[in-house]
Curated annotation (Swiss-Prot):
Lineage of source species: Bacteria, Pseudomonadati, Aquificota, Aquificia, Aquificales
GO-annotated biological processes: 'de novo' UMP biosynthetic process; purine nucleobase catabolic process
EC code: 3.5.2.3
Protein name as annotated: Dihydroorotase
GO terms for MF: allantoinase activity; dihydroorotase activity; zinc ion binding
Native source organism of the sequence: Aquifex aeolicus (strain VF5)
Length: 422
């Protein structure tokens, strides 16, 4: 029997309302016991004194670029970033080449991630064949192969009849539709429509591009009974629309990218193309509304939208590929809300663990007895810098490059096996 004890840590597990100093006994990859002063002579010991111990983090929005664009990232490099950031499970988006609209690609991803053996990689399937927005993909075979949700992420589904059909099918299968809400007739530009786009003379992406689609798909979710999950929510009005539907009992959830909590559109003036992302960084009032949405529970989870691009793809704002890496910086970014007294550590951990697990319908994000021993151990006060030495991605596109970050994962354990040590 393989046995491991995580000793002396401060354990926080929102799924069980558990908080305090405990030891955790792991046996054969499962949580065996949580108690004070566990003694098992033959067990391996991890001393977590002074550290936070919680369920393994789950990121339900990651771009691994594999297959097809592995010069930016691949399953191995992305998995290394994930475990360094405390993520034991990640959900990969289907805008690969070829896209995840067939079981061959699903099997490739699952087999390669198993071979890498770091974090759990769960694929999503496309809503439409080729992500072209016209013909529904084969949801049944994709789910059977291992897809946990469906999305055309990176592109909106503009045809309302297609989205309605997708929600109906997903409802039958008990999986969510992950919704990239940007009306492409209003979101054809580069950065947020506002003072910075005017100052720089750049084409813009109107906030109503997001808001209109959220309203439409909230109505469709209400009519079909399907679960719509709004990706990377970014505006104040978007949150008000989501709250409206939640109050009516509609199956609607949403995520926020930590970058939208940290930065406004003005970050483009500092970081240039590394601050270009879709949906774009918004105004201060939107950022503050998102923070309030986290505090009030309107926003269900954090999700990085980890989107790697090479330096040559990020040279000029107007021609740059949109996206920011985030797997290694998610924890210190979210901890800024804790340090400012906006949310508790328990709330922060809830948004990284049990909440995303519930959204995708997996029995993870918990330390309950018998569950997979996915454990993240972190120091909320350790300072570090994201640079050439610490970055594990193939790409470096983030406004946080070279910045001092506070909060560091020390150990990541997946299925009882240590997959990362600082």
């Amino acid at each position: 029997m393989l046995k491991l004890i995580v000793k002396n840590g401060y354990v926080i597990d929102p799924s069980q309302n558990l908080e305090g100093e405990f030891d955790i006994l792991v046996e054969n990859g499962k949580i065996k016991k949580i108690d004070k002063n566990i003694l098992v002579p033959e067990a391996e010991i991890i001393d977590a004194k002074g550290l936070i111990v919680c369920p393994g983090f789950i990121d339900i929005h990651v771009h691994l670029r594999d297959p097809g664009q592995t010069y930016k990232e691949d399953i191995e490099s992305g998995s290394r970033c994930a475990v360094a950031g405390g993520f034991t499970t990640i959900v990969c988006m289907p805008n690969t080449n070829p896209p995840i609209d067939n079981t061959t690609v699903v099997n490739y991803i699952l087999q390669k991630s198993k071979s890498v053996g770091l974090c759990r990689v769960l694929p999503t399937g496309t809503i439409t064949k080729g992500r072209k927005g016209k013909e529904i993909a084969d949801f049944y075979s994709l789910k059977e192969a291992g897809c946990v949700a469906f999305t055309d992420d990176g592109s909106p589904v503009m045809d309302s009849s297609v989205m309605r059909k997708a929600l109906e099918l997903a409802s039958q299968l008990g999986v969510p539709i992950m919704d990239h809400c940007e009306d492409d007739k209003l979101a054809y530009g580069v950065i947020n429509e506002g003072e910075v786009s005017a100052l720089l003379g750049l084409s813009s992406r109107a906030p109503e591009a997001e808001e209109i689609q959220i309203a439409r798909d909230g109505i469709l979710a209400q009519r079909t009974g399907g679960h719509v999950h709004i990706q990377h929510v970014s505006t104040k009005l978007s949150l008000e629309i989501i709250e409206f539907f939640k109050e009516k009992g509609v199956k609607i959830t949403c995520e926020v990218n930590p970058n939208h909590l940290l930065f406004t559109e003005r970050e483009v003036l500092n970081s240039g193309a590394n601050a270009r992302v879709n949906p774009p960084l918004r105004k201060k009032e939107d950022r503050l509304a998102l923070i309030e949405g986290v505090k009030r529970g309107i926003i269900d989870c954090f999700a990085t939208d980890h989107a790697p691009h090479q330096t040559f793809e990020k040279e000029l704002v107007e021609f740059a590929m949109p996206g920011i890496i985030g797997l290694q910086t998610a924890l210190p970014s979210a901890l800024e809300l804790y340090r400012k007294g906006i949310i508790s550590l328990k709330k922060l951990i809830e948004m990284f663990t049990i909440n995303p697990a519930r959204i995708i319908g997996v029995d993870l994000g918990t330390l309950k007895l018998g569950s997979p021993a996915d454990i993240t151990i972190f120091d909320p006060n350790k300072e570090w810098i994201l640079n050439e030495e610490t970055n594990l991605s193939k790409s470096r596109n983030t406004p946080l490059w070279g910045k001092v970050l506070k909060g560091k994962v020390i150990y990541t354990i997946k299925d009882g096996k240590m997959v990362y040590k600082d």
